[in-house]
Curated annotation (Swiss-Prot):
Database matches in NCBIfam families: spare_glycyl
Phenotype caused by lack of the gene: Cells undergo an apoptotic-like death upon DNA damage characterized by membrane depolarization; further disruption of recA prevents membrane depolarization.
Gene that encodes it: grcA
A Gene Ontology cellular-component term: cytosol
Induction and repression of expression: By acid stress.
Protein name according to UniProt: Autonomous glycyl radical cofactor
PROSITE patterns, per the entry: GLY_RADICAL_1, GLY_RADICAL_2
Function: Acts as a radical domain for damaged PFL and possibly other radical proteins.
Entry-linked InterPro entries: Auton_GlycylRad_Cofactor, Form_AcTrfase_GR_CS, Gly_radical, Glycyl_radical_cofactor_GrcA
Keyword Plastid: no
GO molecular-function terms, A-Z: formate C-acetyltransferase activity
Domain Glycine radical: 5-127
Keywords: Acetylation, Organic radical, Stress response
Amino acid sequence: MITGIQITKAANDDLLNSFWLLDSEKGEARCIVAKAGYAEDEVVAVSKLGDIEYREVPVEVKPEVRVEGGQHLNVNVLRRETLEDAVKHPEKYPQLTIRVSGYAVRFNSLTPEQQRDVIARTFTESL
């Protein structure tokens, strides 16, 4: 279990008011911040901290997300009607730019098939 602490009393002045994460399962302490003597993210055995007093501090641990292959999201802030009108009347929308596969492209430069595909993928009823 991980516990966050702020050291309030220690024989070593470098530890005073420093913040640490204590891992009770491994018997290790990870330095979050210290005035001197310890580097950020330095890991030491809890016994190396010596005789200390501390107060617990809240720690929020977020689960680590690992995705094989990655994910990608393109956001276009448009109405379906705007894109459909751009297909019918491209001269009215010479500057209409959308995101496709991570890059910006003028909607009118896409082929009709690509335009239909963008409209179909962008506007769905549900996920």
